[in-house]
């Protein structure tokens, strides 16, 4: 058994500072936060897209991508709830703009099926919070099978971000 002093030595506290910008936490003149978030969506999307676009070279910038493009022939997008709906839209755009085969899976189903993991597939996990339990379990399953994993999350300190081999933060601000 581990005594209390040993247990305390194993735990490391880490303080994360949130944005001090009150605009992120106040609803201002809006009746509801949801109305505020809907109104802010165009700027939020623009900021996210601009993070990854090189306007001068008219190209996409994804720095430090750990996989060789030639090693990837397909993409599987995995999420739950509204993140799953984001995967549906992403599938459409990937198919329009790339030659990749794209599949979508609901995380809660993915983890219970008998999956045929493919070494040439990039498994992309989508989660706003980065803490969705079913999505995390699906990521863990892929990691145990040594698959190529990537996450699209808003919280870069999240469990899903930490355990993915590559992270694409969306920088949408606090929930």
What is the predicted function of each stretch?
Residues 1-11:
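Single conserved hydrophobic/aromatic residue that forms the stacking wall/gate
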Residues 19-54:
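Helix-enriched interaction subdomains in cytosolic or periplasmic regions
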Residues 14-18:
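Flexible, low-complexity linker/loop segments at domain and module junctions
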Residues 70-175:
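Glycine-rich phosphate-binding loops that contact phosphosugars or nucleotide phosphates
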Residues 54-71:
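A short, well-structured juxtamembrane/interface segment
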Residues 48, 56, 100-102:
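Short coil-to-helix leader/linker segments, especially the first N-terminal amphipathic alpha-helix
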């Amino acid at each position: 058994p581990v005594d209390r002093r040993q247990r305390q030595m194993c735990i490391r506290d880490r303080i994360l500072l949130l944005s001090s910008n009150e605009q992120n936490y106040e609803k201002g003149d809006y009746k509801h936060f949801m109305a505020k978030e809907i109104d802010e969506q165009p700027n939020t999307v623009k900021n996210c897209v601009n993070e990854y676009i090189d306007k001068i070279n008219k190209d996409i910038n994804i720095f430090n991508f750990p996989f060789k493009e030639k090693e990837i022939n397909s993409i599987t997008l995995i999420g739950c709830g509204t993140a799953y709906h984001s995967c549906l839209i992403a599938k459409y755009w990937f198919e329009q703009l790339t030659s990749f085969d794209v599949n979508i899976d609901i995380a809660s189903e993915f983890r219970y099926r008998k999956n045929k993991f493919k070494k040439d597939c990039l498994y992309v996990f989508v989660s706003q919070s980065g803490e969705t339990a079913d999505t995390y379990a699906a990521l863990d399953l892929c990691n145990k099978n040594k698959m190529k994993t990537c996450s699209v999350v808003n919280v870069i300190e999240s469990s899903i971000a930490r355990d993915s081999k590559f992270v694409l933060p969306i920088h949408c601000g606090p929930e």
